[in-house]
Amino acid sequence: MPGSVTSVFGGPDDFHAALREDGVLSLLVTGNGPFRARLTQVALDHMHLSTGDEHLSRIAFVGVPADTLLVSLPIGDRPGPIWGGVETQASELMTFGPGQRIHTRTTGPCRWGAIRLSSEDLAEYGRALSGAEFALPPIARWRPRRAALRQLSHFHHAAIRTAEARLAALANSQTAHGLEQQVIHALIQCLSARPVDQETEAASRYRGLLARFEDLLLGEPFPSMDQVSVTLGISKRMLREYCRKHLGMGPDRYRRLRGMQLVRRALRSGAEETSSVCEVARRYGYRDPRRFLVNYRALYGELPSATLQRTPRRTATRSK
């Protein structure tokens, strides 16, 4: 059933939770200061549209759900996310096929748009409209005709604007169906030409190594770089090179920031009331209390003791 939700977030954990259905497996804030983000999500019968407005740099690890195509499109004149080390222009789209795993990062305030729909549905509509097979590469960058991209952006924006204004139009099944058909038609027009760039075998292999790095950190948050290198079967030099391209930083710093996030999450969970901040920090690999406190305050804008009593702020309005 069509519906929508617009949310404002004061903490990254709630923001991440809202993005899980879109395939966001992890979210790591890398910018300093208070977290602020706004997210509007629109669910139609056969697709989901969303737009996000973020104020701090972050790295997200995305796993596109099975039988799903994910489309990243530009919003306004703000820079969009960097996908797998690839920067996109305001005139470009990125598409990601079912099951693809990739890192996406921002380097400051960012606004982005996304479309998520069944890859089989898109292929069926594409065949019907073009009269030929409609198959997309696993990951590709597109530069549609200006008129086609303008039309897609218009329909995407119309759905988002309707949701944010809390209008009842999306609750009308005929209106929602008509909007969905317009978005699909405009999207197929944008993807009918050849992509300007598609992932090479080498790039796919490098991306897979970074996905395995995430798997390793999930099971062992603080592996040594020697251990990571041996497990992934690459040199430490190559690991650093891949991480800088995809993550915007070296593997050691990424690992430490993830550790800081785990500490913050533990402090906010309410399960650490009988533990000191230093005990929690040591449990997650931080041996120097003074350095930990300085780095924590620089990253989150508050001392760990304040985190113990701080509640994430979130407001949301829903319409169906």
What are these regions (language model features)?
Residues 1-34, 80-226, 230-236, 249-250, ...:
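Alpha-helical bundle regulatory/interaction domains
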Residues 1-67, 72-73:
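N-terminal low-complexity or simple alpha-helical regulatory segments
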Residues 239-243, 247, 291-292, 296:
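Short hydrophobic/aromatic patch on the recognition helix
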Residues 243, 251, 255, 296, ...:
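DNA major-groove recognition helix of helix-turn-helix
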Residues 42, 81, 292:
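Short aromatic-centered micro-motifs
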Residues 228, 238-239, 254-263:
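Aromatic (often tryptophan-rich) hydrophobic motifs at membrane interfaces
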Residues 49-50, 56-102:
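Well-ordered mid-protein domain cores that form the structural environment of catalytic cofactors
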Residues 64, 206, 256:
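Short, conserved glycine- and acidic-residue-centered signature motifs
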